[in-house]
């Protein structure tokens, strides 16, 4: 019976789900907006909301809980230093999910999950390969 089963399995093992959501949390905090499938976005939302609440509470113990959940110290720093002060007057509802059509290939429902009042410049920052200036000048 499926009584009391509130979370989706997403066709993954428990370890894979935990790692995937840790990576997605770090990506969302870094870029403040990510595109994913709708079921993943719906499962990610409460995890991120709880992380922002941890950031708002502050303290070393909450920081360690966030590191254990996300496994990315740089993004935990951003969570506590940038996002927590931004949402200090907001009681929940830090993220929104916007439906984004269907993916070509498998027709999966896609969605954009983003922070409310997000920083527009954070999208795509520090993503992908970078070219070193010294190599570009030598060529």
UniProtKB/Swiss-Prot annotation:
Keywords: Ribonucleoprotein, Ribosomal protein. Residues 120-139 are annotated as: Disordered. May be methylated thrice, on undetermined residues. InterPro entries: Ribosomal_bL17, Ribosomal_bL17_CS, Ribosomal_bL17_sf. GO terms for cellular component: cytosolic large ribosomal subunit. PANTHER family: LARGE RIBOSOMAL SUBUNIT PROTEIN BL17M (PTHR14413:SF16), RIBOSOMAL PROTEIN L17 (PTHR14413). Part of the 50S ribosomal subunit. Contacts protein L32. This is Large ribosomal subunit protein bL17. It comes from Rhodopseudomonas palustris (strain ATCC BAA-98 / CGA009).
């Amino acid at each position: 019976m499926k009584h009391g089963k509130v979370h989706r399995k997403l066709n993954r093992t428990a370890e894979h789900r935990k790692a995937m959501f840790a990576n997605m949390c770090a990506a969302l905090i870094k870029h403040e907006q990510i595109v994913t499938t709708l079921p993943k976005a719906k499962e990610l939302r409460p995890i991120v909301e709880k992380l922002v609440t941890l950031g708002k509470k502050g303290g070393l113990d909450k920081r360690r809980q966030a590191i254990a959940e996300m496994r990315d110290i740089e993004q935990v720093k951003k969570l506590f230093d940038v996002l927590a002060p931004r949402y200090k007057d907001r009681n929940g509802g830090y993220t929104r999910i916007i439906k984004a059509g269907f993916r070509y290939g498998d027709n999966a429902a896609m969605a954009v999950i983003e922070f409310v009042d997000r920083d527009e410049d954070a999208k795509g920052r520090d993503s992908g390969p970078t070219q070193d200036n010294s190599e570009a000048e030598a060529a």
